[in-house]
Amino acid sequence: MQSTTRVLVIMRHAKAEPSAPSDHERVLTDRGTADADEAGAWLGAAGATPGRALVSDAARARGTWAALAGGAGWDVEAEYDASLYAAGPDTALDLLRETDEAVGTLVVVGHNPTMAYVAQMLDDGDGDAAAVAAMSEGFPTSAVAVFAVEGPWADLEMGGARLTAFHVGHG
């Protein structure tokens, strides 16, 4: 059986305003919008085009997706998922596993600490040395971790992806 390499992009939302009527309603700052746009340009230049975009339904994640997609030049409709807003690592991983097998590239935009935990736990330790070193220094706002995933999304496990790139958007 031939293995298919898929691409998984995990992103922490961009810089958001410190307050709003509720945490869920916090919007991006101007810097956050610029950072997400730059991260999108970086991903677009790398040739990434998502077949699925799974995004938290929080305002700051929605804004991050809009700027990211704009910067990359993507015309992809995001799937906004309320459960990703407060998901722990196990729940987030379950959401990734639900991705249709026809999807070659999956982009996920969510929140810390979950995005950082999932990225660190998926890493098989055999990835790009510079990317691994950069990710080990932290997962700030607008951080993007790119992984190669062998096999079906449904079989994705901790330690089951190779980190190929890490970038922090700076607009």
Q: PLM features: residue spans?
A:
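Residue-level preference for the first positions of well-ordered beta-strands
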Residues: 8, 105-107, 144
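Domain-level recognition of soluble alpha/beta enzyme cores
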Residues: 123-162, 168
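Short, glycine/serine-rich, charged loops/turns that create anion-binding
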Residues: 15, 58-60, 113, 151, ...
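Glycine-rich phosphate-binding loop signature in dinucleotide/nucleotide-binding domains
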Residues: 46-48, 99-104
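A glycine-rich beta-strand to alpha-helix segment
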Residues: 104-123
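Short, surface-exposed amphipathic charged segments that create phosphate/polyanion-binding patches used
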Residues: 93-99
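Active-site-proximal alpha-helix that buttresses catalytic centers in soluble enzyme cores
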Residues: 2-91, 123-129, 139
